[in-house]
Amino acid sequence: MNSPEDLMELPLDLDGLTPDWVTQALSHRYPDTAVQAVSIDGVIAGTASKARLRLAYRDGGNPHGLADTLYAKGGFHGPQQLELGGVGYVREALFFRHLAPKLEDLEIPGAFFSATNAVSGQSIVLMEDLTTRDVTFGKATSPVSSDTAAVTLEWLASLHGRFWNVPVSDELQPWPGVIKEVTTTLLSEEFWGAMTGRPLAAPVPDAMRNPERTRQALEAMWAAFDNIGPQTLIHGDAHLGNMYFLPDGQPGFLDWQSPMRGPWADDVTYFLVGSLSVEERRKYERELLQHYLACLGAQRGVVAPGFDDAWLAYRQQVMHGFMWVATPPQMQPDDIVAANTERFCAALEDLETLRALGL
């Protein structure tokens, strides 16, 4: 069933974010809001566009005490961007409408409006401007400490635990998401050769430069899913670039374009291997995995996997992050791709991922 918000016309460019449109959007959840002026104070364009809006309210037009700045996220930079990322925009809008209200005790950005339009393909979320809370945004070139990793695993255990083996929205994409859909393109001789031929790909083991070998490993990982344990709600893209940290160090997750019903080990392995330095990961990964399992097992109604099964699942899931090497520069800067490639290639060998997958 559509929400009343979905009946709104959703602008396809930034010029459409007028005072009247923002007033109408905010009034769905915050009646009697009246915006007098909107100015765009910075734009980040990628798979989705994120525009920082500075609002001026009419006298008496802010009875709910809304902030003077917020972010509008959607496809505002042409049909190609909308075609590329539109499915993700829909999922994020639906996440903030249906699932975020069930996660109020977890740190995620606030959302003031979320809507999707099946005709235009546009979806828009008006969300909190996190800079007003003096957060620090995660970046792969700045790995976290083992203590921060432990707190983040507590966050993930809380997310996973409350949806453990419980049906969640049918609108979620099936695990493993887009990576499986684009495998043929990623592993084509032309594309794979170009990506693994870059200097940043120097850590890639010789065997994995063969796209067919990589395909076999990915397919073995996906096939192993049935042995990983109960499904749950996962973030689906739990890397440092999708995280932020409050001044007291508490973590939060951004970018909910890829929530999935899938295996807990996807989030845990992707986060741990990608967020710790190689040295820290080698030193603390077993201890941190045990910590996650203890936190998961403390959730109501959850029987956490035993350590041996969890360790195997953790080793197998390294293949997800290994695919960072196939990320082109128009999607992520080279320094971010290089940092993740180094960490996942080291883990691939340290953890004998191919052997864990029966290859």
Label the predicted regions:
Residues 2-3, 247-252, 266-273:
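Short acidic (Asp/Glu) and glycine-rich catalytic loops that position anionic groups and cofactors
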Residues 1-46, 58-67, 139, 170, ...:
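Regulatory N- and C-terminal appendages and interdomain linkers associated
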Residues 84, 94, 98, 258-261, ...:
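Active-site activation/catalytic loop segments of kinase-like enzymes and analogous catalytic loops
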Residues 136-145, 253-257, 272-276:
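Short helix/strand-bridging catalytic loops that position acidic/His residues to coordinate divalent metals
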Residues 38-185, 264:
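Conserved ATP-binding subdomain of kinase catalytic cores across diverse folds
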Residues 42, 119, 148, 230-237, ...:
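Secondary-structure capping and boundary motifs in well-ordered enzyme cores
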Residues 135-235, 247, 343, 347-359:
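ATP-dependent phospho-/nucleotidyl transfer catalytic cores
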Residues 46-62, 71, 218-264:
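Active-site acidic catalytic loop and adjacent metal/ATP-binding pocket
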